[in-house]
Amino acid sequence: MLDGVGPTLLAYSDLFLVQCPKCRSCARIFTPNKAKGKDNPRYLGHESKRLLCVKCGYTKDIHPKQRWDNHWAFSHELYDVKQGVDWYFGLPLYLQTQCCGHKLWFFNYEHLFDIENYIKERVRPSGLYYLSAESRLPKWMKLSKYRGDVLKAITKLKCH
């Protein structure tokens, strides 16, 4: 990470908290340890993923395939990040709520805490800011008139 620049959205993609498709409780999508080995090149966002629900035991794996040009890719397009779903299975994110007439969502608690810290700041970073996940936040989230409402919604999600 560059000094003074928050992580990119892709940096949070090692863990998604989603609604389990079977029981609707909190399930995790993560990169299994064996997918991080040196024999299988790991490209951030294009590694094998596992869906696991500890409440009901539901599991499902998804693996990228090596293409003709030696790049790793999934057989499907990754989901649009604006939809409030994970990129791999298309499941609704667990950490989401309505706020100020918009959907507020986070991939995981690290993502939530980083955005919370950004929203709390009165003076926001400049410089290489455009590389960060914070720079991609919708305008309404950055407006001071919504700061209190956004922070209340985040507090509610932290207890989720």
PLM regions: where:
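Acidic, Ser/Pro/Thr-rich low-complexity regulatory regions
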Residues: H46, K55, D69, V81, ...
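C-terminal, charged low-complexity interaction regions
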Residues: E134-H160
